[in-house]
Amino acid sequence: MNVLIIDSGVNGSTKETINFVQYEDNNDYLEHGTLIANIIRAINPDVNIYSAKVVDRGGSTVNDKLAQALLYALFNNIDIINVSLGLPSYSDTIQDIINKLAKRGVIIVAAAGNNTSVYPALYNNVISVGATDDNGNIEPYSAPADVYTYGTVTIDNTTYTGTSCSTAIITGILSRGGHN
């Protein structure tokens, strides 16, 4: 199963890394994309991880970079796209690319957002993921979503919280089961 992580990059082993951030190398300085990859790999060690770096070391990105990463997926045999990031504005171009990906059977899983709803989770043909606590109650910070799962994970004695973690869990589960 080929999973593309659109994020701040992925440190460590990937099938391919594509960098859409000008004047930066492929390193994940924020370690956010690396966290997402580690969560997915914990659920499915056999997954093929591809990385599209669209977030710079300052933590920002724009719709154009997201569109470029989605176009990469459209032409490169990607099965599932994980987008654990959010942008505030709608783009017709991105919705068009998402529709084309959906027609090809590519699943797009996106974080619903922490404290506010964000794109790409708000686009059509995207599975938005929210966060719950250990008892299955929706976390107060979680934006409304299509599906919910745990929003807290612990890796190497460090605890991480947010809809980004929830999104990686759903991506990991989907990557284990295949899809058609």
Residue positions per predicted region:
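Acidic-leg catalytic submotif of subtilisin-like serine proteases
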Residues: M1-E24, L35
